Design a protein with these regions (language model features):
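Conserved phosphate/ATP/ADP-binding segment of small-molecule kinases
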Residues: 1-73
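C-terminal catalytic "cap/lid" subdomain
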Residues: 60, 142-143
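Hydrophobic residues at beta-strand termini and immediately following loops
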Residues: 76
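Conserved post-catalytic alpha-helical subdomain immediately downstream of the catalytic base
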Residues: 46, 51-54, 79-142
Length: 143
């Protein structure tokens, strides 16, 4: 699920819930200090458990991503990119995360691949498809 504020609480029991940091803050009525790097894991865990999500995946813009999936927590820093346009980045992230999850990837692999894909589409103007060969090359560089 890639939620918006209007229907933020409509997805109890979802396998993976993916707000960005702004959506999480607004949806939960929090201020920025509640979502600092130190406070984020506890906030995510509490919300994940209250909504009975298997996983909660937060995109953090220039800070990367944070994922709490089942019993594993993963923080992945952003990769340095020349950002042209963020349109479609969230859709790319949830699409890659869903595919990786369906393929049996670990939470760390899901977070890393989705983070890479979201960053790659931000290098182009407008909403663009992710180029699979480019994602594969970037992912190969992680080893």
């Amino acid at each position: 699920v890639d939620p918006k504020k209007k229907n933020f609480f409509a997805y109890q029991g979802a396998t993976l819930f993916k707000p960005n940091l702004h959506e999480l803050r607004d949806g939960l009525g929090l201020d920025s200090s509640d979502l600092s790097s130190l406070a984020l894991p506890a906030t995510v865990k509490k919300f994940k458990e209250s909504q009975n999500f298997e996983g909660l995946f937060v995109t953090l813009s220039e800070r990367g991503v944070y994922m709490d999936f089942r019993s594993e927590q993963v923080a992945i820093p952003a990769h340095i990119r020349q950002i042209a346009d963020v349109s479609g980045a969230g859709d790319t992230v949830i699409s890659i995360a869903a595919c990786a999850l369906a393929a049996g990837a670990s939470p760390a692999q899901i977070a890393e691949l989705a983070n890479l894909g979201g960053g790659l589409v931000c290098e182009s103007l407008g909403v663009v498809p992710i180029q699979a060969d480019l994602l594969k090359r970037e992912a190969a560089g992680l080893d």
